[in-house]
Amino acid sequence: MRPMFILIAGAGRVGSAVASRALEAGHEVSVIDSDPLSNERLDKDQLTTWEDAGGTFTVGAALELDALLAAGIERADVFLAATRGDNTNLVIAQIAQRRFNVARVVVRVADPGRAAWYAEQGLNTISPTQSAIDQATSAALSA
């Protein structure tokens, strides 16, 4: 598999974990987050700093085109929207998909109903809430 350029919006638990795994797998990874201290979460998963390990970090709001451009969205093979807000994730995922023609766009959506609708619109949605519902139901109803 050829190395991909992966852009991740949001350096929280999900975004930073995916970023670290992708970097370890040999991909080029760029993370954008509005909190300048959020790169500390990226650093803690590395033996060195995130940047020394080969990752890039951009401070900026992913809803701002200039910040997305600075983070490298124009050359992204994959875009992951993993900020705290469903609305933000859905908007930036559509920007990545429609304006920048990113080949693979993955968006985290807490609301299962919205996740299903956006999946029908062509976005690759992940709903942690739906996953928890499915697992809890399975555990509760299994004999």
Q: How would you name each of these model-derived features?
A:
Residues M1-A143:
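Cytosolic regulatory regions of ion transport systems
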